[in-house]
Regions:
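Trp/Gly-enriched beta-strand surface patches
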Residues: 1-76
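Beta-strand-rich recognition/accessory modules
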Residues: 44-116
């Protein structure tokens, strides 16, 4: 998950999701979520990408005005076993890229190999 500094300007925080996602709280296994926030007068964009090989049932917590967001899932891991998952997080100064550009980044990330 990602959390900006405590003095983020809460009224300027907003989120962006893939085309068709209207309620992030009810959506599972979406490919990405993005956030725009302002800190000390500077605007930032954060893109959080989830790999398609991640455990299923993942939900994004991406609605808080103070900027904390991330992806969460539940999984049973037996003693001696491990669980692999992959997320990409990109932070940039300025405005978020357009939804289509973030989708292109997500599509490229989804083609990377996750080591098991």
């Amino acid at each position: 998950q990602f959390r900006p500094a405590d003095d983020v300007e809460k009224k300027k925080t907003s989120y962006l999701f893939p085309e068709g996602v209207t309620d992030v709280k009810k959506s599972k296994d979406i490919a990405w979520a993005a956030e725009s926030f302002t800190l000390k007068g500077q605007k930032y964009g954060v893109m959080h990408l989830s790999h398609p090989e991640n455990p299923k049932g993942m939900v994004y917590s991406a609605y808080r005005d103070y900027g904390r967001f991330g992806a969460f899932f539940q999984a049973d891991v037996s003693k001696g076993e491990s669980l692999s998952f992959a997320h990409g997080i990109m932070v940039k100064t300025g405005d978020l890229p357009a939804r289509e550009e973030i989708q292109e980044l997500s599509d490229a990330f989804s083609k990377t190999v996750v080591k098991k």
